């Protein structure tokens, strides 16, 4: 009886917490940009005309990372597009559930060299990885020469929905310079089924213990 009461109490506690709990679906420090595709990331440079670079691992000659080892951040620059071109370079996270809503946060900055300006915007997709799939959230961001923290939310989507978070580096190639993105996380509200299964597990535990009691 005591165990059953404990299981019921735990189940009620789970129900109370569920509405506010979030789990980390993506946690990327960009120590190894080359390994991102294998982890579900998509790097899509849709600049026109396309240039000689895309998203790449930072290296010597630029600013240090916000966190982690010295160059553990992902970078992009004016060479994403050819001279006179337009930059549209997309960074898509792995797919995660959007049913319960989610929060995406990261740090970003530019060099801040006089005469140049760097812009990014953030958004989501329903899973696609092309420029046409991009759904912008919030306004355009003009980066500064200081690591700055950005957070944006993805509203609750229909039952079973999944999607990706997106960062787009954009602008005129001739007046753009260099950007870095570091420490990106996606926190999601778990699907109701996750909590239901946990509650069933507690109930099953109480049932098994009750059946094991001696006659």
Model-based region annotation:
Residues 84-88, 171-187:
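Extracellular carbohydrate recognition
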Residues 17-21:
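Sec/Tat signal peptide C-region and signal peptidase I cleavage site
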Residues 191-208:
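A short, hydrophobic C-terminal helix/tail in secreted or cell-surface proteins
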Residues 1-8:
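Bacterial N-terminal signal peptides that target proteins for export
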Residues 129-159:
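Extracellular carbohydrate recognition and processing domains
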Residues 23-24, 29-78:
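Extracellular glycan-recognition surfaces and repeat-rich motifs
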Residues 82-100:
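Short beta-strands within extracellular/lumenal beta-sheet-rich domains
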